[in-house]
Amino acid sequence: MAGLSSSQIPDGEFTAVVYRLIRDSRYSEAVQLLSAELQRSSRSRAGLSLLAYCYYRLQEFELAAECYEQLSQMHPELEQYRLYQAQALYKACLYPEATRVAFLLDNPAYQTRVLRLQAAIKYSEGDLPGARSLVEQLLSGEGVEDSGGESDYDGQINLGCLLYKEGHYEAACSKFLAALQASGYQPDLSYNLALAYYSSRQYAPALKHIADIIERGIRQHPELGVGMTTEGIDVRSVGNTIVLHQTALVEAFNLKAAIEYQLRNYEAAQEALTDMPPRAEEELDPVTLHNQALMNMDAKPTEGFEKLQFLLQQNPFPPETFGNLLLLYCKYEYFDLAADVLAENAHLTYKFLTPYLYDFLDAMITCQTAPEEAFIKLDGLAGMLTEQLRKLTIQVQDSRHSRDDESAKKAVNEYDETLEKYIPVLMAQAKIYWNFENYPMVEKIFRKSVEFCNDHDVWKLNVAHVLFMQENKYKEAIGFYEPIVKKNYDNILSVSAIVLANLCVSYIMTSQNEEAEELMRKIEKEEEQLSYGDPDKKIYHLCIVNLVIGTLYCAKGNYDFGISRVIKSLEPYHKKLGTDTWYYAKRCFLSLLENMSKHTIMLRDSVIQECVQFLEHCELYGRNIPAVIEQPLEEERMHTGKNTVTYESRKLRALIYEIIGWNV
């Protein structure tokens, strides 16, 4: 019946056809027929009413509201149309308009429904005291004349939502749990409970309820294609249907992704997003779009920025969007863009940024032009946070001493949250001196924070890096790198390649060659096992370790051994040559060429021949490999022909020929 027009429908069958389409949830086709019919008879009450219903089911709430507005003007005596108009406006997030229409309703028969709607509007607008007042009025039955008073079940849910918004997550859990036990399984209620558990950092019970939602959704609605995209199966969009909304699958997968992201299981987080029922990009809800942008930022930063910028223009958008966009601008050092967004959206600053986040962003933006001033701002922020950490430490100790487990748990959670705020401030301070290569000062900043951060992995990793960079503290660097590596020894490829490389170099520089060799054998073994399952997968860990070791020997002037190590590390080229590995290799070659041009070193002909052959291989295998990864928002893009390993390897080969006087 796709594309059916009014003229094709036999006389007297139009209404039956429309109702059949609605029965089969083919609302778009029903809209086409009804719209065409209303062009001929624009004041048809039945036609407008059905059209409004179809728009509502298609989640085209503004269009539904327009239809209901026409109906209420045509039939002012039928107040249900005004109520439906207010509900559609609320669903379209047009809260002032919905409030205005709701206030026009004075029929006692609709009083409870109007109060519920007004409470929902105030809740969505962030007016929690106003929402609570209306919810309590409904629960008490005060001033409610119609018979449809608020049930205890609805009341528990509404109070749970208010408690959640007020930050009382455990109390919200109790309300949702009571409602769930009273009603039996409800997908949206299970999601509310999972969200409250997540916000109180109780990830295990949150994941349990999420798994329940997903399992039931798959069993009851196999047509929604859960997991198909992850498995690489090409499937068509399931659309934003009412059935999809009722299953709460989209919400559950987004929450699962958020939990995995918090637990730093980034692959699992991305998989949660691809597991959700397939939809076209234009059909995605704001939360999914936001999470996709965030979790694919490393691989697709340009797309990520575009999605976040797009969301910022929508009403509403996820409240985290504004802060995350600004933080990512700072991460990629687009400080001017961050400053512009802050200046252009002052009204959002007070609504979506906490004082801490605003002060942090202000300091980060200041770093670009006035690093000394930025350091002072960050120092003030750090001082405030360390004071909070000390107070919370005392609270934890006092609670444990008095055996008040609940207070101790609350204080520990607050301590962890405050520490997560302190670490970025500390790292931003350290980066100011790192950029000036003042490594002793960076070390001093880290040592001042040892009281709070000595168990934090990010802190330990950065302490290791700054000790390593000072070149006379390799032994101390080992003390920080080793625990990180040993913690993940059974899954060593999950450790950053540069951490493994720096640890190997530190072993070599402290004459612990056996430890370095053992670590490299372990990496090689894991890479071999991984390549059995996926022979074409590029794995760079051992390659980067060898490149860094080769770089070390080149830096010490032993180019014969260093360059040979670099060359061997990139074999086989089809698996080892990449943007990152080329970066390390070309640095060594540029250093070699500089010293050759100054006549400070002499290389054997066999080594020069080896270099030329290496660059020829890089030219052959590097045609489709970018020489550098461009910044995502760069206005002037590099010439595509020049931004390849092939182009740069030719340039290096030409320089070799020029320096040694070979004719080509």
UniProtKB/Swiss-Prot annotation:
<dbReference type="GO" id="GO:0005929">
    <property type="term" value="C:cilium"/>
</dbReference>
<dbReference type="GO" id="GO:0042073">
    <property type="term" value="P:intraciliary transport"/>
</dbReference>
<keyword id="KW-0970">Cilium biogenesis/degradation</keyword>
<feature type="repeat" description="TPR 1">
    <location>
        <begin position="11"/>
        <end position="44"/>
    </location>
</feature>
<feature type="repeat" description="TPR 7">
    <location>
        <begin position="458"/>
        <end position="491"/>
    </location>
</feature>
<feature type="repeat" description="TPR 8">
    <location>
        <begin position="543"/>
        <end position="576"/>
    </location>
</feature>
<comment type="function">
    <text>Required for polyglutamylation of axonemal tubulin. Plays a role in anterograde intraflagellar transport (IFT), the process by which cilia precursors are transported from the base of the cilium to the site of their incorporation at the tip.</text>
</comment>
<dbReference type="InterPro" id="IPR011990">
    <property type="entry name" value="TPR-like_helical_dom_sf"/>
</dbReference>
<feature type="repeat" description="TPR 2">
    <location>
        <begin position="45"/>
        <end position="78"/>
    </location>
</feature>
<feature type="coiled-coil region">
    <location>
        <begin position="507"/>
        <end position="534"/>
    </location>
</feature>
<keyword id="KW-0677">Repeat</keyword>
<comment type="similarity">
    <text>Belongs to the TTC30/dfy-1/fleer family.</text>
</comment>
<dbReference type="GO" id="GO:0035720">
    <property type="term" value="P:intraciliary anterograde transport"/>
</dbReference>
<protein>
    <recommendedName>
        <fullName>Intraflagellar transport protein 70B</fullName>
    </recommendedName>
</protein>
<keyword id="KW-0969">Cilium</keyword>
<comment type="subunit">
    <text>Interacts with the IFT B complex components IFT27, IFT46, IFT74, IFT52, IFT57, IFT80, IFT81 and IFT88. Interacts with KIF17.</text>
</comment>
<keyword id="KW-0802">TPR repeat</keyword>
<dbReference type="GO" id="GO:0030992">
    <property type="term" value="C:intraciliary transport particle B"/>
</dbReference>
<keyword id="KW-0966">Cell projection</keyword>
<feature type="repeat" description="TPR 6">
    <location>
        <begin position="423"/>
        <end position="456"/>
    </location>
</feature>
<feature type="repeat" description="TPR 4">
    <location>
        <begin position="188"/>
        <end position="220"/>
    </location>
</feature>
<dbReference type="GO" id="GO:0060271">
    <property type="term" value="P:cilium assembly"/>
</dbReference>
<dbReference type="InterPro" id="IPR039941">
    <property type="entry name" value="TT30"/>
</dbReference>
<feature type="repeat" description="TPR 5">
    <location>
        <begin position="385"/>
        <end position="418"/>
    </location>
</feature>
<dbReference type="InterPro" id="IPR019734">
    <property type="entry name" value="TPR_rpt"/>
</dbReference>
<feature type="repeat" description="TPR 3">
    <location>
        <begin position="153"/>
        <end position="186"/>
    </location>
</feature>
<keyword id="KW-0175">Coiled coil</keyword>
<dbReference type="GO" id="GO:0036064">
    <property type="term" value="C:ciliary basal body"/>
</dbReference>
